[in-house]
Swiss-Prot record:
Gene3D superfamilies: alpha/beta hydrolase. GO terms for biological process: cholesterol homeostasis; intracellular triglyceride homeostasis; lipid droplet fusion; lipid storage. It catalyses: a cholesterol ester + H2O = cholesterol + a fatty acid + H(+). It comes from Rattus norvegicus (Rat). Its EC number is 3.1.1.13. It comes from the Eukaryota. SUPFAM superfamilies: alpha/beta-Hydrolases. It is found in: Lipid droplet; Endoplasmic reticulum. Keywords: Endoplasmic reticulum, Hydrolase, Lipid droplet. One of its GO terms (cellular component) is lipid droplet. InterPro entries: AB_hydrolase_fold, LDAH. This is Lipid droplet-associated hydrolase. Probable serine lipid hydrolase associated with lipid droplets. Has low cholesterol esterase activity. Appears to lack triglyceride lipase activity. Involved in cholesterol and triglyceride homeostasis; stimulates cellular triglyceride accumulation and cellular cholesterol release. Acts antagonistically with PNPLA2/ATGL in regulation of cellular lipid stores. May regulate triglyceride accumulation indirectly through stimulation of PNPLA2/ATGL ubiquitination and proteasomal degradation. Promotes microtubule-dependent lipid droplet fusion. GO terms for molecular function: sterol ester esterase activity.
């Protein structure tokens, strides 16, 4: 269903079955089906946003809208949910793509490896081969973006922007040291607590709680965010988080070296997930890399209050690299 937002940026929310699970896609721009030869002329590039964890797709809408406007509407901006991070509302249809080559389920789709395969499956099914891709990975979305490029080299990715990239030593980071015991040793207790508290909770109460939480964060959402309190989604976010602590350890220097001309890294100065020494190590090991260290005080969770600033930087990078059509 498409909705025209107040600032004139068309935003579409759709739900697809991808790899056997419900997947939310939020699309900024007039293009809803890139295979459709009728209507609006097909764009040459697609900006594809891969969120962090537990970054639900609607949190990225202000960023996507700002980015779409700043690239003058030349390229659509799509945000994909992680597998298991959304439940399709009763008033929405779950769509399928006739081009989808892999209707079979993806093994361990809620885990880190499965999330990578999930993104590959969607791109192969929903994006024509002649549409070039611009990836934006945030946090663990950066790790996923790198591995999508590595595993599916046929995808026409022209550039990837890795924002606050958690691509190494996650459990050793300041936040990781705190989170690892909860995500790896006590996650079943977290599952049980979320089910006991939120499973019997009426949707009206969940919506009220989410609304109050968003007000506290000064975040206005145009799309529903009650998945924040769905035990199914919380459990999958915790499971993925635990896998991140276990598997995102050694930096994949071989992949980075091979893809380096197509990569831009943006590190935070006060980031508890990828601290400054990770940036310094990257700068030492890859002196030719396109590396940036934040000078604007933008936090790791930039979608909470810094979407405009982040979109402005990414738009400048894109506008300086790509033709305007």
């Amino acid at each position: 269903m498409a909705s025209e937002v107040e600032d004139g940026v068309p935003v579409h929310e759709e739900f697809f079955l991808c790899g056997g699970v419900e997947t939310q896609i939020i699309k900024c721009g007039p293009w809803t089906n890139l295979f459709d030869k009728q209507g609006v002329s097909k764009p040459k590039h697609l900006i594809f946003v891969i969120p962090g964890n537990p970054g639900l797709s609607p949190f990225y809408v202000p960023f996507a809208k700002a980015l779409y406007s700043l690239v003058k509407g030349h390229f659509p901006v799509w945000i994909i949910s992680h597998a298991g991070f959304c439940l399709t509302p009763k008033d929405k249809k779950i769509l399928t793509a006739p081009q989808e080559p892999n209707a079979q389920e993806i093994e361990d789709i809620y885990g880190l490896n499965g999330q990578i395969e999930h993104k590959i499956a969607f791109l192969r099914a929903h994006v024509p081969k002649d549409v070039k891709l611009i990836f934006i990975g945030h946090s663990v979305g950066s790790y996923i973006a790198l591995h999508v490029m590595n595993r599916a080299p046929e995808l026409p990715v022209v550039h990837t922007f890795l924002l606050f990239p958690t691509i190494e030593r996650m459990s050793e980071s300041p936040n990781g040291k705190f989170a690892t015991p909860f995500l790896c040793r006590f996650r079943y207790m977290l599952y049980a607590a979320s089910y006991l508290i939120f499973k019997p909770c009426p949707e009206m109460i969940k919506s009220f709680i989410v609304q109050k939480v968003l007000e506290k964060m000064s975040f206005k959402s145009e799309l529903r965010l009650t998945d924040l309190l769905q035990p199914f989604c919380l459990a999958n976010a915790a499971y993925l988080g635990g896998q991140e602590m276990i598997h995102v350890v050694k930096r994949d220097d071989g992949i980075i070296k091979e893809l380096l001309p197509k990569l831009t890294f943006y590190y935070g100065k006060t980031d508890g997930w990828c601290p400054v020494n990770y940036y310094e190590d990257m700068k030492r090991d890859f002196p030719e890399a396109n590396l940036h260290l934040c000078e604007k005080g933008i936090p790791h969770a930039f979608v909470l209050g810094f979407s405009q600033e982040m979109a402005a930087m990414v738009a400048d990078w894109i506008n300086n690299r790509l033709p305007k059509k």
